[in-house]
Amino acid sequence: MKYVTLLLQVGVLYVFSLVGTWIQGVFHLSMPGSLIGMLILFLLLSTRVLPLKWFELGAEKLIVFLPLFLIPSTTGLMEYGSFLFSKESIIFLLVVASTVVTLIVSGYISQLLITTKK
């Protein structure tokens, strides 16, 4: 039963992403659809239209894999190495700094969420 609940919760989170992508496509927004879906989910959770317990188990399992979601964006930059170094290395430094800040902030928020739950 636990696995079914986990699959349903992750599936519903994915549906929010799909709805956001659909809204982005219909209205031709420059904001990513997955971000729109997260904003919709945030609004529904913060107004208590949807209870947090409906997503808690699935979100906990996804947070465990959060660092793995950051790896493709970082390794994808290797394709543009010549471009990054051609602009007097300022772009390279900005990319490295933003990656480090993203890792630190996401790690801090993950730890904060884990400790506040306990």
UniProtKB/Swiss-Prot annotation:
The keyword Transport does not apply. The keyword Transmembrane applies. Its main location: membrane. Disulfide bonds: none annotated. Keywords: Cell membrane, Cytolysis, Membrane, Transmembrane, Transmembrane helix. It is found in: Cell membrane. InterPro entries: Holin-like_CidA (IPR023760), LrgA/CidA (IPR005538). One of its GO terms (cellular component) is plasma membrane. One of its GO terms (biological process) is programmed cell death. It is a multi-pass membrane protein. The chain crosses the membrane at residues 4-26, 33-52, 62-84, 91-113. Belongs to the CidA/LrgA family. CidA subfamily. Increases the activity of extracellular murein hydrolases possibly by mediating their export via hole formation. Inhibited by the antiholin-like proteins LrgAB. In an unstressed cell, the LrgAB products probably inhibit the function of the CidA protein. When a cell is stressed by the addition of antibiotics or by other factors in the environment, CidA possibly oligomerizes within the bacterial cell membrane, creating lesions that disrupt the proton motive force, which in turn results in loss of cell viability. This is Holin-like protein CidA 2. The lineage of its organism: Bacteria, Bacillati, Bacillota, Bacilli, Bacillales.
